[in-house]
Amino acid sequence: MTTPLPRPNRQLPLFSQAPSTPEDITRTTPLKATFDLFAQRLITDGKSDHTIVAFSADLDLLAAYQGEATPIGDIAITDLEGFFDWMENGRDVPCSRKTYARRMTTLKTFFKWLHEIGALRADPAKGLVQRSGPAPLSDVLSPAQLRDCIESSRTFTYKRGKDPDTRPEMLLRLLMDTGIKKNEAMALTPMSLVLDDPKQPVLQVRFKVRNVFKERNIDLASTWLPLYDAYARQYAPTAVIFDCTARNLEYVLSDIGDKAGLPFKLSFEISRWTCGLRDLRAGMTDDYIRQKLGLSDISWYETGGKLRELDRRLHERGE
C-alpha cells in the first residue's frame, strides 16, 4: 500500500493570480505558481528540452508532496529533507540513484533561482546533502602519473621502424586537454580544428543529444599544434583525424599506461576524468567544466561531486 502523502495536495484557488514576471514572485507566492517562470528561465539559459521536462516533473512531485498552494517562503530545509526521505522510503515507486541525484539538482537549481531573484531571503536547498549511494569513483592520473605517461608516449616507433610514432603523444595530450569521449574523438576531422588564431587554437566537437547534433568549442593548448602537425605529416589524415578503429586507439592508450607503470588500465574514460580534475584544480568554474565536457546540469551534479572527491583523495596523498 502506498504511504499517504504527509500533506494534502491543495489546488490553487481559482481566483489566485499567477505572477507574470520573476519580479512578481514573493515569499507568499504559491509554489505551483512559480513553475512556469522557472521553466522560462531554463529556456533562456539554453537548457535542453529533456532537462526542462525532467525538472518540471520533479517540481510537480515536490508540489504533490508539499502542497501546490504552499507559499514558497514557508518551505524550509527540513521540508525538503522530508521530501527526499518520502521519495526513497515512503513511496511505492523505486527511486534509482540517478533519479535521486537529478531531483536533488532540480531542487537546488529551483530554490537557488528563487533566492537570486530576491523572492527568498535564504536558499532552503543550499544545505541539502546527497544521501543516495554514489557510483564508484573512476581511477584518475595524478600529476606524477601524467608526466610518466607523457614520457612513455614518446617511446613508440612508427610501424616498428626507427622513426618515433607521433600518434601516442598527440592522442594523449588531446584527451588530457579536452576530455572528449571516444566517439567524439573518432568523429574529428581536420576541419574540427579552428586555427584562425595560432596562439589559441580551438577544437570544434560535434555531439548528439536526442538525435540532434550540437557543437561545443574547446580551447586547445598552442603547444599541441606542433604535435598535430607532426602527426599529420606521418599519418596524412583526410576524412577523419584518426583513420583507424576505436579499439586501436584504446590499445594505444593501454600501451602508454603499461609503459608508464600505471596500476590500472589507461582509457578514454580515465583521460576524461583526469581532464576534468586538472581543470578543477586550475580554478575553472563548475559551469566551464560542465560545458567543456558536454554535460547537462543533471549529469554534472554527480560528476562535480566525484571530481571534488577525487581532488580530496589526491590531496590527502600529497599529489
Regions found by a protein language model. Give the residues of each.
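Short, basic (Lys/Arg/His-rich) helix/loop patches that form interaction surfaces
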Residues: 158, 251-291, 295, 309-318
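N-terminal core-binding DNA-recognition domain of tyrosine recombinases/integrases
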Residues: 36-50, 56-137, 158
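Basic, Lys/Arg- and aromatic-enriched nucleic-acid-binding interface segment
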Residues: 148-182
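Active-site/catalytic core of tyrosine-dependent DNA strand-transfer enzymes
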Residues: 219-263, 275
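Conserved tyrosine-mediated DNA breakage-rejoining catalytic core shared by Y-recombinases
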Residues: 187-224
